[in-house]
């Protein structure tokens, strides 16, 4: 790259920002990076704001997975490593006609030891026996629907009361329609005949390779928004341009050059990293490749509402010392999960002793976006009264709407993505993807995709 090549990154979530950082930091020669973000702020669905007298309470993701190193490494690179704190270790529950502790020794809901599972109050005697015979069953080969696979291996109760609530709460998903491949921790277990035995070995290996008591999750003390703020500052300090309110409506190609058209200005590029959601990317990619654009347009996204409450200390039941609870789909009305934030995070404890509670409503197949704020609050409080047996009256309320923000990885998602990339590779070389719509939804996965996209882009530019 003898001259300054131009790269446009479309999308200012953590994947787009990390891509921009990596492009500048890793390029062996001058490079001009422009990041275009359609909204008036960067961060995607990572957002942190003051609440109930606390300086920083997250409005979406409140942590990242530490044992998958990519997000932790990024935080350290940005100088935030010392500011990462871990949850308190308070235990979570499942509400199924009452509260039940989530059994120990699970891997995303999959039992790793039969003994702890057998002691759980969450399952009927039949459900326990059905799960216990899993190692004796013949191998299951059709493995690209989480729900179908887990039911075949462990029976209905383990799927409905453990795996679906746990995975569904992360991805806002219906696991009957969600790809096993999209959840690497589970997908790895399908390579062996017994999922239970494989889960046990995976947990033992993870324990062996980590320090005793090492946290599974971490978050900056100033909230996940601190990661975005520091990252965007680093990107601009290194010379990249971040353009807000720059919605891309089309991309055209002339020779080896691309032109990215926004409402306000056109941008020239030698390569493009698409780090925007598939539903936003499909329209502007159709100009480059009709087939790829149509495939992306067919991908679905779920909507979630997160209601944050501050409950006066005098109202909060003293016995509720856990980190929150999940609601299995057959038991759901509107609330899918509730997190008792002040129990989960030591730095989320207001001076007046209030309990910070975050309540999730909506998922794939359960739309709540049409309700107004008052209705949503009433639905949340009514469900919590059923679950907790107490009529809560919050003194602070915040409602965060995340419309079509959770990509739904249907079975065979990665085969369709490969088809998109193969088609684009022929018609639009130098266009690559990164972000939650493509190869993983969690923050570490988005960071990893960004690093990979940067490497691929620099390799492409080196041949021009």
Q: Could you tell me what each predicted segment is?
A:
Residues 2, 244-357, 363-374, 386-387:
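Mid-domain catalytic core of redox enzymes
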Residues 24-52:
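Glycine-rich FAD pyrophosphate-binding loop
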Residues 48, 103-111, 319-321, 336-464:
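Conserved flavin/dinucleotide-binding core of flavoenzymes
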Residues 67, 152-153, 169, 275-276, ...:
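Short, well-ordered coil/turn residues at beta-beta hairpins
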